């Protein structure tokens, strides 16, 4: 099965290419912390030879509580992203929540992300597609993997086939998510690159009084399971002090564990992609 290649600068993204990392922090907490986090990712990915795109949100529009930290907002967020690009020369991915934000974000960021909760919002999907930017489509927790085809079709009908699919877990009763490993193969049949958001797959939505809980201790186990499916890449969030992070700390990898974590996943990715295809249908 031919796999579509998406290019972001010098990076080639495809299910049969070396693993690409979309990595960073959940939300921009400050310019200095964003610089610190990106610097560590750049250092580690350059050492390991992993193609890298920096990830952070400028606004978390779907927090559990009205008092929860949301981020610096659109204007300040774009300024921070521009500073990061200038300092480190890395591509950037961030999420868009409203149609009016799409064009503004696409002027600065190399990949724009369609949030899982909003992935069926046609006006937002079309506005993002019309920017011509590469789009990372998060699979909603309530969607079957085969339903992602409808979102792909909306983008293509709007004139954009520069698309990536991203698994982030499925609702499993209340306050819990599970990852259906069979879903990766279903989405790969669409021939677009498929990523695994291991961070948010670890969430326990509403698991704490006013925010989501998480299962950080299992991040390596779940990441290995995902990468074993021969994917285009991994989506990962890390933090210098996860216990005090302003959003999704319970799911975030400790930043000082980034190198040993990625070293194992790179070896696994290389091993899996060295195997010949076996037709089992």
From Swiss-Prot:
Top-level EC class: transferase
Alphabetical GO biological process terms: keto-3-deoxy-D-manno-octulosonic acid biosynthetic process
Localization of this protein: Cytoplasm
Keyword Cytoplasm belongs to the record: yes
Domain of life: Bacteria
Pathway: Carbohydrate biosynthesis; 3-deoxy-D-manno-octulosonate biosynthesis; 3-deoxy-D-manno-octulosonate from D-ribulose 5-phosphate: step 2/3; Bacterial outer membrane biogenesis; lipopolysaccharide biosynthesis
A Pfam family: DAHP_synth_1
Reactions performed catalytically: D-arabinose 5-phosphate + phosphoenolpyruvate + H2O = 3-deoxy-alpha-D-manno-2-octulosonate-8-phosphate + phosphate
Keyword terms, alphabetized: Cytoplasm, Lipopolysaccharide biosynthesis, Transferase
One GO MF term: 3-deoxy-8-phosphooctulonate synthase activity
InterPro entries to which the protein is assigned, alphabetical: Aldolase_TIM (IPR013785), DAHP1/KDSA (IPR006218), KDO8P_synthase (IPR006269)
EC number: 2.5.1.55
Record-level GO cellular component terms: cytoplasm
Principal subcellular localization: cytoplasm
Transmembrane segments: none
NCBIfam families for this protein: KDO8P_synth (TIGR01362), PRK05198.1 (NF003543), PRK12457.1 (NF009109)
Family: Belongs to the KdsA family.
HAMAP family recorded: KDO8P_synth
Alphabetical list of PANTHER family matching this protein: PHOSPHO-2-DEHYDRO-3-DEOXYHEPTONATE ALDOLASE
Protein name according to UniProt: 2-dehydro-3-deoxyphosphooctonate aldolase
């Amino acid at each position: 099965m031919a796999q579509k290649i998406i290019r972001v600068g010098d990076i080639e993204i495809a299910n049969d290419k070396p693993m690409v990392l979309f990595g960073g922090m959940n939300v921009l907490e400050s310019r200095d912390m964003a610089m610190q986090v990106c610097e560590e990712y750049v250092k580690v990915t350059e050492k390991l030879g992993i193609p890298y795109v920096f990830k952070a949100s400028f606004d978390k529009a779907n927090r559990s509580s009205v008092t929860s930290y949301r981020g610096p907002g659109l204007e300040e967020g774009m300024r921070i992203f521009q500073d990061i690009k200038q300092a480190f020369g890395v591509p950037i991915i961030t999420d868009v929540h409203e149609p009016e934000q799409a064009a503004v974000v696409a002027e600065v960021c190399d990949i724009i992300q369609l949030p899982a909760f909003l992935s069926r919002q046609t006006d937002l999907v079309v506005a993002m597609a019309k920017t011509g930017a590469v789009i990372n489509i998060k699979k909603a927790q309530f969607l079957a993997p085969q339903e992602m085809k409808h979102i792909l079709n909306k983008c293509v009908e709007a004139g954009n086939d520069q698309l990536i699919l991203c698994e982030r877990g499925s609702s499993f009763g209340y306050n819990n998510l599970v990852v259906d490993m069979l879903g990766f193969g279903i989405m790969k049949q669409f021939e677009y690159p498929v990523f695994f958001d291991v961070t948010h797959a670890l969430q326990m939505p509403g698991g704490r009084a006013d925010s989501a809980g998480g299962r950080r201790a299992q991040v390596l186990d779940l990441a290995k399971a995902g990468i074993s499916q021969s994917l285009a890449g991994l989506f990962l969030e890390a933090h210098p002090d996860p216990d005090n992070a302003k959003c999704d700390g319970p799911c975030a990898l400790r930043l000082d564990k980034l190198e040993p974590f990625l070293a194992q996943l790179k070896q696994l990715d290389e091993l899996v992609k060295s195997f010949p295809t076996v037709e089992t249908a």
